[in-house]
Amino acid sequence: MLPRRRLLKALAAAGLLGPAGISGLIRDALAKGDAPIRPGLHKVRGEVIVNRRLATEGQLIKPGDTIVTGANSEAIYVIGQDAFMQRELTTVNFGGEALQNLMRVVSGKILSVFGKGARTIQVSTATIGIRGTGCYIEEENHGAKARTYFCLCYGDVELTPSAAPKEAERYSTTHHDKPMYIHNDMKMPKMMVPADVINHTDDELTLLEALVGRRPPSWGSGSRY
């Protein structure tokens, strides 16, 4: 079971501890320990839209759904073995029945943790094949000016830039070891360039993994992020 103090710290960092005390989401996570909580939307802040309709906490997210967050908004949700923290001004689409392992990040920023099994993430600049990972994505601009920030926080990935498929890389990380920017600009000497760790934390990853009954690989090692 996750130590109460560390889990509460992660939940507070994600803005889930309010003046009313422990929310239903937090009670479920603490009470079940390593057991996953029910699927669906577990935090709705601001304007969150699912399939062109305003979303509510507890709502189920299904294959084929599109989730959109407005300004100063955020959504935390669970789909099967996977959990997501979708930040403001972000649009994400999940593949339908025949493409349940496909996720499209159309715009914005999202932190995700995935269970065992292969998944494919499509972004404006690349196709990202993952397995049992935590990752953070930010999408910027469109067309030739598009740029994607990608941090494989831990796990395995096969990353293929759309503008230069021959530069595809397959690698593994354990703790934010290889963040990068992926470009669409053919004038650049390389489409993938090193980056820093930005805009996501180990506490947020701890929260998401707790919601699906897991722990990040770096758990208890003295987080730097």
Language-model-derived ranges and their functions:
Residues 7, 11-15, 22-63, 70, ...:
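Flexible, surface-exposed loop/linker segments and immediately adjacent secondary-structure boundaries
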